[in-house]
Amino acid sequence: MSDNRSHIEEKYQWDLTTVFATDELWETEVVELTQAIDNAKGFSGHLLDSSQSLLEITEVELDLSRRLEKVYVYASMKNDQDTTVAKYQEFQAKATALYAKFSETFSFYEPELLQLSESDYQSFLLEMPDLQKYDHFFEKIFANKPHVLSQNEEELLAGASEIFGAAGETFEILDNADMVFPVVKNAKGEEVELTHGNFISLMESSDRTVRKEAYQAMYSTYEQFQHTYAKTLQTNVKSQNFKARVHHYQSARQSALSANFIPEEVYETLIKTVNHHLPLLHRYMKLRQKVLGLDDLKMYDVYTPLSQMDMSFTYDEALKKSEEVLAIFGEVYSERVHRAFTERWIDVHVNKGKRSGAYSGGSYDTNAFMLLNWQDTLDNLYTLVHETGHSLHSTFTRENQPYVYGDYSIFLAEIASTTNENILTETLLKEVKDDKNRFAILNHYLDGFKGTIFRQTQFAEFEHAIHVADQEGQVLTSEYLNNLYAELNEKYYGLTKEDNHFIQYEWARIPHFYYNYYVFQYATGFAAANYLAERIVNGNPEDKEAYLNYLKAGNSDYPLNVIAKAGVDMTSADYLDAAFRVFEERLVELENLVAKGVHND
């Protein structure tokens, strides 16, 4: 690993020449695409002239969108690999501007399409059978018809989009640019400025004094700005409720979930079922208290790992282990994994200027690339199989669907990645016999479950409560938000709000509350993945085949129908109950290891 990208071996860098062989070819495509988008301006007002025009304009729009995605992928990934290079900052800005131009040019498309009556649409299908392959694409647009206003009204609302988004943007600037946190001490006794970036690592410290100081420094700062954060959050909630109301939805939640055709019962079932199983989280908190040897568990004690042992994997060892684990899906899946690992789909190591974190990206006509910032840890092995899950989902979808259905809903995205993580856990627990290593694996799993199912559902419950409160005329003051959040936190963790005063301000630092009913999908996805992984590892070949069909389906059907074919009914609590059974089994094993004194070895 080197700070300088030029020193990193080529085999550890993604190969973006498979997208565009040279920067010059990218620039040529941008010029040609700009011209093609300009040429499309004449389509406005003519979409429904005939069945032929509907087909031609639809296909031009999809073709330009497809080319634009490829242009954007190249620019954004070139920029992500080293954000200090001005040339690629400019490339990304050009690609973003081109997206805006494309959106503006085709803004007529949906309003005009919605003027088409059902009888005329059926006549068009008879006249032009080639339209049939777009039937589901059109159907999803038509389903939105009761919620689309007149063209003038929609243009008026579109013109106010920056105003509606201002609360979220204000939060981002306040939280990321203006907020300054105190200086605290790390585990080495060194003074460091507290930041969003180092907060979690400080909270994971084995030194309780370090954790407590970081926790109090973080939340006492939010306490000072609680009234401003309450106003930005209230404004965002009011914006969502207003937009839902004028578009004839009963609530902001109904509006948000309808975008993915998700019934509200999925959300309700999640909250109800998680609440039913909260005693399991309380039990895990008690075990955590015992392992840490504390008289009284505080909120600053819930992130530190219970195991000081970290199983180590070099990147090449992680590739080998991942291929072994994912072979369970069969030959076709394994062959694609091998290609991803050997044909330079992955940008592996940290380098100066590289975007932090990890993701899977790409477009319909490119490889499903992955960005990593590799460290030799168990956590990074999980990251590798997670991102490989996303990339294989994209690959299977693109190989089996036309471009129009060649992507998938956010609601389904996390299932493929976390199924891989859960299969890794199942496999490691089958293979690893050493008590200390089993302890580390179980701790990793239980903390992941805590952070994804329990915590994200707590967020989802809070998010819905504040939208309902605003609808009912409640002013979302900081006092109201603090009390609501403190009560929810006490209910979830079983730790009294009196003893954990500062946690009442946590709502102020959560960006997801500006994402409009997004967080619940983390919890539903993780639970579905738990359920599917167990079926794949312990079930029959039909279960694997059903799962691969889900990966292939893309947007060819509604999300709930796609995942139902894999064996999960997400309107029922069964998949959630099954996930909690796995959680309890693993909690019992960890409790037994603690009873044996493994944590003290």
Curated annotation (Swiss-Prot):
Key word Hydrolase present: yes
Residues binding Zn(2+): 386, 390, 393
Enzyme active site: 387
Superkingdom classification of source: Bacteria
MF terms in GO: metal ion binding; metalloendopeptidase activity
UniProt keyword Cell membrane present: no
Places the protein is found: Cytoplasm
Entry function: Has oligopeptidase activity and degrades a variety of small bioactive peptides, including bradykinin, neurotensin, and peptide fragments of substance P and adrenocorticotropin. Also hydrolyzes the synthetic collagen-like substrate N-(3-[2-furyl]acryloyl)-Leu-Gly-Pro-Ala (FALGPA).
Cofactor note: Binds 1 zinc ion.
Gene Ontology terms: cellular component: cytoplasm
Biological-process GO terms, alphabetical: peptide metabolic process; proteolysis
Organism: Streptococcus agalactiae serotype III (strain NEM316)
EC number: 3.4.24.-
Family: Belongs to the peptidase M3B family.
Protein name: Group B oligopeptidase PepB
UniProt keyword terms in alphabetical order: Cytoplasm, Hydrolase, Metal-binding, Metalloprotease, Protease, Zinc
Enzyme's top EC category: hydrolase
Alphabetical list of InterPro entries matching this protein: OligopepF_N_dom, OligoPept_F_C, Pept_M3A_M3B, Pept_M3A_M3B_dom, Peptidase_M3B
Gene this chain is encoded by: pepB
Pfam family, one: Peptidase_M3_N
